[in-house]
């Protein structure tokens, strides 16, 4: 979900000594406490000193968090994509959207090592091309994640509130087409990030920053414009659509005891709806804090206290952490994903369990069963 935070992380601060690290100077849409003004001059000396008292332990802690996010997120999301590709029964409309979300999260986790290095070195040592790529991946991840979650919510709304229309709309093919459209739409921002992104040497402090490069004479205007656009189109509007969809779904679920002609199918429908709701809720919880910081900064009410700067760092880390949480949620909340994960990790054990189950079913037929031979719930 989900995540221009990386641009912030790719931007070094004015100084970083063993005793204190300044907040990185950012040309992204994130708050900038020690940022250069429209003329390119660094903030006042008193302001810099005021914002400089950040414990050197903070970059180390955040680097440790990013290391966990990198391993869990990359492995977990790769496993999710493999499972959806490998197992035919997993190719449902909902899972096609989950594949898209996993792809975006897996891509952004690949930037974690670079972001960690910047936190520790307080400079961008990887060159201009890689800077453009990292910034672009950040914006792609942010927009594709929230757009995909929005479409998943709309998909659930149609499945719950308009089951007849769902037969035509909710197909794997149409879900794939929508995913392609999401990436094309996100490209309007991602390609712009490639064009505008780049490195800049700050000779006054002898560091290299990786950020969006706006014209110096119009820097403040473009910076504010970028923050407002991201806040509105990548957070406010999608979240409002999601809230409307789930409000209508809750009203529908409360008013009807049985959504379909089968109790088992109805259970699966509610189960998948709950899964999507949890994934969306976790995304909003992880990303709301940093968006609040953005809103506060845009209103000009920033603080240079140690607590504020430390909170800012960890809100960014929280946003990135979301990229590693979804595979864990699938494993705990969805029986089909859990079964496929176990089948991949423990193939011999799962094969023996299936053989045992098949022998029992051959002996005692259960006409009410809604599970296939592999033990998977039928897709809804």
Curated annotation (Swiss-Prot):
Disulfide feature: 131-210
Ranges that cross the membrane: 58-85, 96-119, 133-154, 174-196, 223-247, 275-296, 312-333
Domain of life: Eukaryota
GO CC annotations, alphabetized: axon terminus; cytosol; dendrite; membrane; mitochondrion; nucleoplasm; perikaryon; plasma membrane
Name recorded for this polypeptide: Kappa-type opioid receptor
CDD domains: 7tmA_Kappa_opioid_R
Lipidated positions per record (S-palmitoyl cysteine): 345
Function per UniProt: G-protein coupled opioid receptor that functions as a receptor for endogenous alpha-neoendorphins and dynorphins, but has low affinity for beta-endorphins. Also functions as a receptor for various synthetic opioids and for the psychoactive diterpene salvinorin A. Ligand binding causes a conformation change that triggers signaling via guanine nucleotide-binding proteins (G proteins) and modulates the activity of down-stream effectors, such as adenylate cyclase. Signaling leads to the inhibition of adenylate cyclase activity.
Residue ranges that the UniProt entry lists as topological domain Cytoplasmic: 86-95, 155-173, 248-274, 334-380
An annotated GO BP: sensory perception of pain
Glycosites: 25, 39
Entry's family note: Belongs to the G-protein coupled receptor 1 family.
Chief localisation class: membrane
Stretches assigned to the Extracellular side: 1-57, 120-132, 197-222, 297-311
InterPro entries: GPCR_Rhodpsn (IPR000276), GPCR_Rhodpsn_7TM (IPR017452), Kappa_opi_rcpt (IPR000452), Opioid_rcpt (IPR001418)
Membrane topology per record: Multi-pass membrane protein
Subunit comment: Interacts with NHERF1. Interacts with GABARAPL1.
Tissues showing expression: Detected in brain (at protein level). Brain (neocortex, hippocampus, amygdala, medial habenula, hypothalamus, locus ceruleus, and parabrachial nucleus).
PANTHER family: KAPPA-TYPE OPIOID RECEPTOR, NEUROPEPTIDES RECEPTOR
């Amino acid at each position: 979900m989900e995540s221009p935070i990386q641009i912030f992380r790719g931007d070094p601060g004015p100084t970083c000594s063993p005793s204190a690290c300044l907040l990185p100077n950012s040309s992204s849409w994130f708050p900038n406490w020690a940022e250069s003004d429209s003329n390119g001059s660094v903030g006042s000396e008193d302001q810099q000193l005021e914002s400089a008292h950040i414990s050197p332990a903070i970059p180390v802690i955040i680097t440790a968090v990013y290391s966990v996010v990198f391993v869990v997120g990359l492995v977990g999301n790769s496993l999710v994509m493999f499972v959806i590709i490998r197992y035919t029964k997993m190719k449902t409309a909902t899972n096609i959207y989950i594949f898209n979300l996993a792809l975006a999260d897996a891509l952004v986790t690949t930037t974690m090592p670079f972001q960690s290095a910047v936190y520790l070195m307080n400079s961008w040592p990887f060159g201009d091309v890689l800077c453009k790529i990292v910034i672009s991946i950040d914006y792609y991840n942010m927009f594709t994640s929230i757009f995909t979650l929005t479409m998943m919510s709309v998909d659930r709304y149609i499945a719950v509130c308009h089951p007849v229309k769902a037969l035509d709309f909710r197909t794997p093919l149409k879900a794939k087409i929508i995913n392609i459209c999401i990436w094309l739409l996100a490209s309007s921002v991602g390609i712009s990030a490639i064009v505008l992104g780049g490195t800049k040497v700050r000779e006054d402090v002898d560091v290299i920053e990786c950020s969006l490069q706006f014209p110096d004479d119009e820097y403040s205007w473009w910076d504010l414009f970028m923050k407002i656009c991201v806040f509105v189109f990548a957070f406010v509007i999608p979240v409002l659509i999601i809230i409307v969809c789930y409000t209508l779904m809750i009203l529908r679920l409360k008013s009807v005891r049985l959504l379909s002609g089968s109790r088992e199918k109805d259970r699966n429908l509610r189960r998948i709806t709950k899964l999507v709701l949890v994934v969306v809720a976790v995304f909003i919880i992880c990303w709301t804090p940093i968006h609040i910081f953005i809103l506060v900064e845009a209103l000009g009410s920033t603080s240079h206290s140690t607590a504020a700067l430390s909170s800012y760092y960890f809100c960014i880390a929280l946003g990135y952490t979301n990229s590693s949480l979804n595979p864990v949620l699938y494993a705990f909340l969805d029986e089909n994903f859990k079964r496929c994960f176990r089948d991949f990790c423990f193939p011999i054990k799962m094969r023996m369990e299936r053989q045992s189950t098949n022998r029992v079913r051959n002996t005692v037929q259960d006409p009410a069963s809604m599970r296939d031979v592999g033990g998977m719930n039928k897709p809804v």
